[in-house]
């Protein structure tokens, strides 16, 4: 399910962010592979994004510490800064975002090409956010 969720998120990101290198998937270097680099042309800052098929993230405030460490670690790698054309000494740490499934969301995907959404801040972390997306559901024909 995790891989399927990753691909679903990728399809949603690519539907919104169509520019070259706005969304990079499974960026890999030196045996480290992150899910996505998100650098929308019209947003102020890029994100290191990880898709986690963990619906429980919608029910409680935080995220699993291992997941937070994983995404935070990717966001501190020098080659990630290079990939995003950032000067590691001149900018704030790269923002981190975890996307998880949440069937309580009103819409399936609320990202905008022109305006950076206000993601839910993960308490205890700096520049670390999470957002739930609603998954498609096949309606049963039987009552």
Roles of regions detected by a PLM:
Residues 1-143:
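Catalytic core segments in nucleotide and nucleic-acid processing enzymes
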């Amino acid at each position: 399910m995790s891989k399927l969720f990753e691909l679903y998120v990728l399809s949603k990101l690519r539907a919104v962010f169509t520019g070259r290198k706005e969304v990079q998937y499974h960026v890999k270097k030196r045996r480290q592979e992150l899910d996505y680099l998100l650098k929308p042309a019209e947003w102020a800052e890029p994100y290191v994004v990880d898709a986690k098929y963990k619906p429980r993230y919608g029910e409680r405030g935080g995220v699993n510490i291992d997941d937070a460490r994983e995404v935070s670690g990717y966001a501190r790698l020098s080659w990630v800064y290079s990939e995003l054309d950032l000067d590691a000494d001149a900018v704030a740490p790269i923002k981190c975002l975890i996307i998880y499934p949440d069937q309580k969301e009103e819409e399936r995907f609320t990202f905008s090409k022109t305006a950076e959404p206000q993601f839910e801040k993960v308490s205890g972390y700096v520049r670390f956010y999470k957002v739930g997306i609603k998954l498609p559901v096949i309606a049963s024909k039987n009552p």
